[in-house]
Amino acid sequence: MKIAVGCDHIVTYEKIAVVDYLKTQGHEIIDCGTYDNVRTHYPIFGKKVGEAVASGEAELGVVICGTGVGITNAVNKVPGIRSALVRDMTSAIYSKEELNANVIGFGGKIIGGLLMNDIIDAFLAAEYKPTEENKKWIEKMDSLQHASQDQNNPHFFDEFLEKWDRGEYHD
C-alpha cells in the first residue's frame, strides 16, 4: 500500500520510526516531511499529506505532531480528507469501518512507538463497511469542505513561518 506520512519538527524521530516500520511491512512511503528538527509549522505537513491522499498519489495517510491535535485538524481542512486523531485501536478501526477515514493522526509525544505501530496496523487492516446511514454521515461531512484558492499559494503559511523565525511560537 502507498502511504503518505508527515510530521512537524517536534516528532521527526517518531515519524522516521513509523516510516521505517511501514517499509518493513512492505508499504511504499511518500515522506512528506519534515526531515529534521528545525522549527516549522505542522499545517504545512498536514496539508502535504492531505493533498497526497486526496489526489490519489497515496492510498492512506499518517500525520504526527506533539499532541496530534494540530496536524490532524490541519489535514482535515484538505477537501476529500477524513482524518481521525486516535490513541487506541478501537477508535482507529471505527474511523475506517464507519467513517471511511483516509488519514490517521497521532500525538507522537503522547503515545509510544510500539503502540502507534499496532494502531497503524489495525487501521490499515480495517475496511470501510458502507451502510446507508454512514454514507449519509460521510456525505454530510464532505459537504462541509470548501476549497480556498489561497491554499494553492506556495506562500500560504509564510506569515506563520516568519513568526516562528522571530521566536513568537514556543514548543
From Swiss-Prot:
Pfam families: LacAB_rpiB. Disulfide bonds: none annotated. Keywords: Isomerase, Lactose metabolism. Pathway: Carbohydrate metabolism; D-galactose 6-phosphate degradation; D-tagatose 6-phosphate from D-galactose 6-phosphate: step 1/1. One of its GO terms (biological process) is galactose catabolic process. GO terms for molecular function: galactose-6-phosphate isomerase activity; ribose-5-phosphate isomerase activity. It catalyses: aldehydo-D-galactose 6-phosphate = keto-D-tagatose 6-phosphate. Its EC number is 5.3.1.26. PANTHER family: DNA DAMAGE-REPAIR_TOLERATION PROTEIN DRT102, RIBOSE-5-PHOSPHATE ISOMERASE B. Heteromultimeric protein consisting of LacA and LacB. Belongs to the LacAB/RpiB family. This is Galactose-6-phosphate isomerase subunit LacB 2.
